[in-house]
Regions:
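Short, surface-exposed charged micro-motifs
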Residues: 64-65, 83-85, 135, 157-161, ...
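N-terminal mature ectodomain segment of secretory-pathway/periplasmic proteins
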Residues: 27-101
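Gly/Pro-enriched, hydrophobic low-complexity segments
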Residues: 144-234
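Short solvent-exposed loop/turn micro-motifs enriched in small/polar/acidic residues
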Residues: 57-59, 68, 78-80, 129-131, ...
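Generic beta-strand structural signal
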Residues: 67-69, 88, 138-141, 162, ...
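Flexible, processing/modification-adjacent segments and terminal tails
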Residues: 21-28, 34, 95-156, 176-183, ...
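Bacterial Sec-dependent N-terminal signal peptides
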Residues: 1-25
């Protein structure tokens, strides 16, 4: 009987800890959403247009991102006279990558598309996460950040770091396939500023691809709900 009682007590304690962690994760997520503008404003974002510059391997050039929520995401950059494009839509994706020897746009492999299509979610994976089928678990703290494990409905996992003071997202760690190999991709966000509609965005994004090379994007301009022609997401014919 004592063993049964101990087992029940242990189960209740474990359940209580799990519930407490979930509640704490929700508190952190809610504070993050509020810090970047609040759920009401995030719900109003239909499109986002970003003008920026990108530095990679000592070279710099203009870049841009255009997003229509749930419809299409397209990032373009020009480095050393070469144009790089990655595009996701609700049906598939394509890319133009001269570094991989490509001279014409090519469809994204299914696995790469699955890993990256979350970029179609314009408000991000934490906003309204449960309704999207995402799961969030608090892993603890690392330095001055809360560490959250975010699992999408497609079972794609990322680790998000939320500053304990500002509640801005400071870093995201994910796995990605590039040129036939899987690597850890770390995105670091800084220089947060308030812009259109009172929304707050990071103006500097640094990405490390498995320590092999780094990419830094510095935002120049962000426009919310600007008209974006969906035709830009269609892969050009070779």
């Amino acid at each position: 009987m004592k063993l049964i009682n101990m087992g029940v007590a242990l189960l209740m304690t474990t359940t209580a800890i799990s519930v407490s962690r979930a509640q704490t994760a929700d508190v952190i997520v809610n504070k993050y959403v509020e810090a970047i503008g609040g759920k009401d404003k995030l719900a109003q974002i239909k499109t986002k247009s970003i003008e920026s510059t990108t530095q990679v391997m000592g070279n710099e050039g203009p870049s841009s991102i255009n997003i229509v929520d749930g419809v299409g995401y397209k990032v373009m950059s020009e480095i050393n006279g070469q144009t790089f494009i990655t595009c996701y839509t609700d049906k598939g994706g394509w890319q133009l990558n001269p570094y991989a020897g490509a001279t014409t746009p090519m469809p994204l492999p299914d696995e790469l598309y699955k890993q990256g299509r979350s970029v179609l979610d314009i408000a991000g994976p934490l906003y309204n996460y449960a309704a999207k089928g995402n799961k969030v678990e608090l892993l603890g703290k690392e330095g001055n950040a809360y560490k959250l494990k975010v699992t999408s409905k497609d079972s794609i996992e990322i680790t998000a770091f939320i500053d304990t003071t500002t509640y801005y997202m400071t870093k995201v760690v994910a796995s990605a396939s590039m040129m036939g190999q899987t690597m850890e991709v770390t995105s670091t966000f800084s220089d947060y500023r308030k812009g259109d509609m009172g929304l707050v965005f990071a103006y500097i994004v640094e990405i490390s691809y498995g320590g092999q090379f780094n990419l830094t994007t510095t935002v120049k301009k962000i426009e919310i709900n600007k008209t974006i022609d969906p035709a830009i997401f269609v892969m050009p014919k070779s």
